[in-house]
């Protein structure tokens, strides 16, 4: 199988992180459990149930369910504001043109993933996807990354992960996959590097501009060599 580039979506390809923050702020306020936006932001990209449990300080199950439902409702109301991050579409097309698989390795629910895919408008280059239904616990646990590898039919030595969150880097590392970091989700370079992401770029466009210096280029050379030997 062709080597694969595994992409997180929220905050990595689509400018959605701060809409999630807004939705969670509203949901927590509705329950009389106000949480500062900066605290929520630092949890974005984490498994949803883990985020709720952490920020609600283990509130009763029915409260956690209402929090999740409130987030979904407020997020859906704001999806008209979603947009691809600079260079996102061009990056996906370039990766596909290099003979690599484009895999959306996200733990977003199916309904959110459908919206994100419409925003990206890149269906012709996407090989495989994952969603929240594929694992019981998502990032920072490595399960969703392993599912993405399995769907692509490759091992960790023939893949690289691209993500914007500490949780992305930790999940990728747990599955043995190198991680390229992006600042577009609002997390500091130093934090991404400490979690294992290297190198780190500003956004998809910055990564695209420096693609030849990354593992993506190495995987493309491997794919080209394998194709020539056929």
Predicted features along the sequence, with ranges:
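Non-catalytic pre-domain segments flanking phosphatase-related domains
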Residues: 1-7, 217-230
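N-terminal helical cap/lid subdomain that shapes the substrate entry/recognition surface
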Residues: 2-100, 122-123
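Conserved Rossmann-like nucleotide-cofactor binding loop
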Residues: 12, 19, 110, 167, ...
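Phosphate- and divalent-cation-binding pockets in alpha/beta enzyme and binding domains
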Residues: 23, 51, 111-115, 171, ...
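Substrate-recognition/cap helix-loop segment adjacent to the acidic, metal-dependent catalytic center
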Residues: 29-31, 51-58, 81, 89, ...
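Acidic, Mg2+-coordinating phosphoryl-transfer loop and its flanking beta/alpha structural elements
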Residues: 106, 160-201
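Structural recognition of alpha->loop->beta junctions
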Residues: 121-129, 191-208
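Short amphipathic alpha-helix with an adjacent loop that forms part of the alpha/beta core around
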Residues: 209-218
């Amino acid at each position: 199988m062709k080597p694969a580039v595994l992409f997180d979506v929220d905050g990595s390809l689509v400018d959605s992180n701060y809409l999630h923050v807004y939705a969670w702020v509203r949901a927590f306020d509705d329950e009389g459990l106000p949480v500062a936006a900066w605290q929520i932001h630092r949890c974005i990209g984490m498994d949803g149930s883990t985020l709720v449990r952490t920020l609600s300080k283990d509130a009763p199950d029915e409260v956690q369910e209402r929090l999740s439902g409130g987030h979904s409702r407020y997020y859906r109301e704001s999806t008209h504001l979603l947009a691809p991050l600079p260079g996102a579409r061009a990056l996906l097309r370039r990766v596909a043109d290099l003979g690599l698989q484009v895999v959306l390795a996200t733990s977003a629910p199916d309904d959110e993933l459908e919206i994100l895919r419409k925003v990206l408008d890149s269906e012709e280059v996407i090989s495989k996807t994952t969603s929240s239904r594929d694992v019981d616990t998502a990032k920072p646990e490595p399960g969703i990354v392993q599912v993405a590898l399995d769907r692509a039919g490759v091992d960790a030595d023939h893949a690289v992960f691209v993500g914007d969150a500490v949780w992305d880097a930790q999940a990728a590392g747990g599955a043995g996959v190198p991680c390229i970091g992006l600042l577009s989700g609002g997390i500091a370079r130093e934090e991404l590097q400490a979690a294992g992401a290297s190198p780190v770029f500003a956004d998809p466009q910055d990564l695209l501009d420096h693609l030849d210096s990354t593992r993506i280029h190495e995987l493309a050379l491997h794919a080209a060599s394998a194709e020539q030997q056929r």
